[in-house]
Design a protein with these regions (language model features):
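Hydrophobic, small-residue-rich membrane helices and short re-entrant helix-turn-helix hairpins
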Residues: 9-16, 83, 163-174, 244-283, ...
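TM-loop-TM module centered on a large, flexible mid-protein loop between adjacent transmembrane helices
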Residues: 86-88, 93, 129, 214-220, ...
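Membrane-interface loop-to-helix entry segments
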Residues: 17, 21, 147-212, 245, ...
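Hydrophobic transmembrane alpha-helices that form the core helical bundles
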Residues: 42, 55, 61, 65-154, ...
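Membrane-interface "cap" regions at the ends of multi-pass membrane proteins
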Residues: 1-54, 63-66, 205-212, 508-528
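Loop-to-transmembrane helix boundary motifs in multi-pass membrane proteins
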Residues: 20, 109, 143-151, 257-261, ...
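A generic transmembrane alpha-helix motif of multi-pass inner-membrane proteins
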Residues: 31, 39, 55, 179-182, ...
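Helix-loop-helix junctions that connect adjacent transmembrane segments
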Residues: 135-144, 174-328
Length: 528
């Protein structure tokens, strides 16, 4: 009887992905090179007394342990397409799940309009500056250049996933090489350079462009701290957070991986800890190469109010610091560019995939129009969903370039996801073993016997995860240092939640008019 309430008897998807495909989806959503760039720039422009190394270690001890457990166990217990919507609608309530995922989809669109512009700035702009191509750098950073490049990457991402998950998997495996390799080259350049050599390289550029030498640059940035404190170190969660949380994208492939009980947990662990290791090596390398207040001045110049008198033609962010450290090496310049191309390409691709799978899951539960459940028998792909998502991405890139551009867009989009995706799903992870309505799902879970001192491991993981999430939300949206920058965007968050809840009640009422009681579907898993 229950299966009659679902819109289809089967999802139409095919289980053909392996653990490396799952890992790749999580890692590419983290976007290692971009995460390292934003980690330093956002954290230290807002909280200049923050110690990145300590912030990463604290994050690793909480979210680094909790995130893979929560997402790996929930997805392995409920291996269906649709991500956190499936878990939260069963464990908590479908209205909460739809409000949360509605907001996540808005955040994904916003995030990826921003990410699509990265092909122009910083990737190609910095590369052109490093190569001395002033005209090229100016064009890729112009509104026209940003829009054209952003549109190209959206279309390429769409074509990479719309007709075949096999082609997506092949492309992703290839792109993992420059995505990880570029970060390793960047970090190696920093670790191989002494402070004396870096200062010499920096001062040579200052002389060439009549800019500020090393000491003058620090002085011009103002009275920046020379050591760290606990407040700003916890505040640095606003920058390092992306190392720990974007493994969640793997959940959207849950209905398409082989051996989900093992594949999903292993993929989640790798997708969190590879970025953590890269982040730790970068942070410790930077403190080895430059003074604490120089790093703060670099963040202020590239992500903050700027530094008066700095006239070199490139932003002094962590990417440029690595290139300068290498003696302006072409290998480092190409490594940065290729790493950005890889993560931008795959992140846009995965974002389109996520939205298509989310709408499919809604449709299966009769929480959306019938075409949400249309899956091509030939390609095993929800082509209509993916096409609509691609069009919204393309239109949104234009809107973003013209009106919405902000260097803190990632923090704003990430904040929306922290509440709607990570906080809500963390709560679901804590409650999963104890909710009567999903007792049958928990009893069938391969992780039901995993306990420490009698407490289910998923509950422990959820608590650790929530500790990090709550701290990050406070320092990114409540603390006086950041709230004036990010708080004004909370109205978008509230509107998205309201729209998702209204959406749920509309479709529930519509199904009731057709004589279908959809409430019975939310105590069990949707069709495979």
């Amino acid at each position: 009887m229950t299966e009659l309430t679902y819109a289809r008897k089967a999802s139409g998807l095919v289980r053909g992905l392996d653990m490396w495909d799952a890992f790749g989806a999580g890692l590419m959503t983290c976007q290692p090179i971009a995460t390292l760039w934003l980690m330093v720039g956002i954290a230290l422009s807002l909280f200049p007394s923050g110690n990145l190394t300590i912030a990463i270690i604290l994050g690793a001890l909480t979210a680094g342990l909790g995130a893979p457990l929560v997402w790996g166990i929930l997805s392995g217990s409920m291996p269906r397409a649709g991500g956190e919507y499936v878990y939260n609608s069963r464990i908590l309530h479908p209205a909460i799940a739809l409000g949360a995922q509605f907001t996540n989809i808005i955040a994904i669109f916003y995030w990826n309009w921003f990410i699509a512009t990265w092909l122009g700035v910083p990737a190609l702009q910095l590369f052109g500056q490093y190569m001395g191509w002033a005209g090229f750098s100016d064009w890729v950073a112009s509104k026209g250049g940003l829009f054209i490049l952003g549109l190209i990457i959206v279309v390429i991402g769409y074509l990479s996933v719309v007709f075949s998950m096999k082609s997506y998997a092949i492309i992703q495996k290839i792109m993992l090489i420059p995505a990880i390799g570029g970060c390793i080259v960047l970090i190696a350049a920093i670790w191989m350079t002494s402070k004396g050599d870096f200062v010499s390289h920096w001062n040579a550029i200052a002389t060439q462009y009549h800019s500020l030498d090393y000491n003058a640059f620090i002085k011009a940035a103002g009275n920046l701290p020379t050591t760290w404190n606990w407040h700003d170190t916890l505040g640095a969660f606003s920058g390092v957070y992306a190392l720990f949380v974007y493994n969640y994208a793997i959940a959207y492939l849950s209905g398409e991986v082989k051996r989900p009980d093992k594949t999903l947990l292993a993929g989640n662990i790798l997708a969190v800890w590879v970025p953590v290791v890269l982040g730790l090596f970068l942070a410790t390398g930077l403190y080895h190469m430059v003074d604490f207040n120089f790093l703060g001045a670099s963040a202020q110049a590239s992500f903050g109010a700027g530094v008066k008198g700095y006239t070199a033609p490139y932003s002094p962010d962590v990417l440029t610091l690595s290139w300068i450290a290498s003696g302006k090496s072409g290998v480092v310049a190409w490594s940065i560019l290729l790493a950005f191309i890889a993560v931008i390409w795959l992140e846009i691709t995965i974002a389109i995939l996520i939205i298509g799978r989310a709408w499919l899951a809604w449709g299966l539960d009769r929480m959306g129009p019938k075409w949400f459940t249309d899956v091509s028998p030939r390609h095993a792909s929800p082509i209509k969903n993916l096409t609509v998502a691609m069009v919204i991405f393309a239109v949104g890139v234009a809107a973003y370039v013209l009106w919405l551009t902000s260097s803190l867009s990632g923090l704003i989009g990430g904040g929306m996801q922290f509440i709607s995706v990570f906080l809500i799903t963390g709560i679901a992870g804590v409650l999963f073993p104890y909710r009567k309505k999903v007792r049958g799902i928990w009893e069938a879970s391969p992780y039901r016997t995993w306990k420490i001192a009698g407490i289910p491991v998923v509950t422990i993981g959820g608590v650790l995860y929530l500790i990090f999430i709550i701290a990050m939300l406070y320092f990114s949206f409540v603390d006086p240092t950041s709230r004036d920058v990010t708080g004004k965007n909370l109205f978008v968050f509230a509107a998205a939640w309201a729209a998702g809840i209204v959406w749920y009640f509309f479709w529930r009422a519509r199904s009731a008019k057709q004589g279908i009681d959809i409430s019975v579907t939310f105590g069990e898993l949707p069709p495979e």
